[in-house]
Amino acid sequence: MEKHIFRQKSAPIHKKAVFSYFKCGEIANFAKTNHHILGMQRSDFEIMAPVGSWESLTAAWQGGADAIYFGIENLNMRSRSSVNFTLDDLHTIAVWCQEHNMKSYLTVNTIIYEEDIEYMHSIVNAAKEAKVTAIIASDMATILYARSIDVEVHISTQVNVSNSEAMRYYAQWA
């Protein structure tokens, strides 16, 4: 049985609801064609798909995703999956997404230890140079560095923001 996620983020500071899906097309097509039933405009949400290979990237686009999120190499929570992108793939992914009118979100959502800081800087710098839409981060070192070089940051679910006080705190980097 495949897992599906269909969730609207309702925190007041969010201007867009985010729908994420794991089975290409089904929920994406439902959301795109039936959003009025949910009392929403199409611009109120974004359909995101996790990708870890060129095949899944193409499937996300064919399935109607507005955006993809992906990790590269070691500093993301999906790094132990059997297929993963490399730093050399980053620019090509970003360009492909731009050409196909998709947003690209790079996950840098692991704990950053002291020995990881230089490597994290190189990944965030490469994301900026490649014009990735934003990074998804959980560690304060990543969040602060990305903001210091004007890279848009989205707070990862790894941060476990579960109340309005935490939301207000992290909103300063939104």
Positions of PLM-derived features:
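Cationic, amphipathic, low-complexity segments that mediate targeting or membrane/lipid association
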Residues: 1-32
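Generic start-of-chain signal for non-secretory N-termini
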Residues: 30, 35-48
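N-terminal basic/disordered segments at the start of proteins
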Residues: 46-67
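Aromatic/hydrophobic pocket-lining residues that form the small-molecule binding cavity
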Residues: 53, 86, 90, 120, ...
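Structured alpha-helical segments in the cores of large, soluble enzyme domains
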Residues: 57, 90-97, 142
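Non-cysteine beta-strand/loop elements that form the S-adenosyl-L-methionine
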Residues: 66-72, 137-138
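Glycine-rich, proline-tolerant flexible connector loops at the mouths of alpha/beta enzymes
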Residues: 69-89, 107-116
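N-terminal active-site wall of soluble small-molecule enzyme domains
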Residues: 102-173
